[in-house]
Amino acid sequence: MFGWAVTFLIIALIAALFGFTGLAGVATHIAWILFVVGLILFVVFLLLGRRGRPPL
């Protein structure tokens, strides 16, 4: 998921050279949404991983 966020961020940065219109604005929003979702999932799985392993 972070790979997609980085991809859209790079697209947004390249398109930003031409101004934040059209593709750049969309790519920026998609990159931001993917980053936030990935960060939330990271925190959730980090907290769930602290519960320990179930008994055998």
UniProtKB/Swiss-Prot annotation:
One Pfam family hit: DUF1328
Lineage, uppermost ranks: Bacteria, Pseudomonadati, Pseudomonadota, Gammaproteobacteria, Chromatiales
Annotated family: Belongs to the UPF0391 family.
Protein name: UPF0391 membrane protein Noc_0482
Organism: Nitrosococcus oceani (strain ATCC 19707 / BCRC 17464 / JCM 30415 / NCIMB 11848 / C-107)
Subcellular location: Cell membrane
Topology relative to the membrane: Multi-pass membrane protein
Assigned keywords, A-Z: Cell membrane, Membrane, Transmembrane, Transmembrane helix
Transmembrane segments: 1-21, 29-49
CC annotations in GO: plasma membrane
Major site of localization recorded for this protein: membrane
InterPro entries: DUF1328
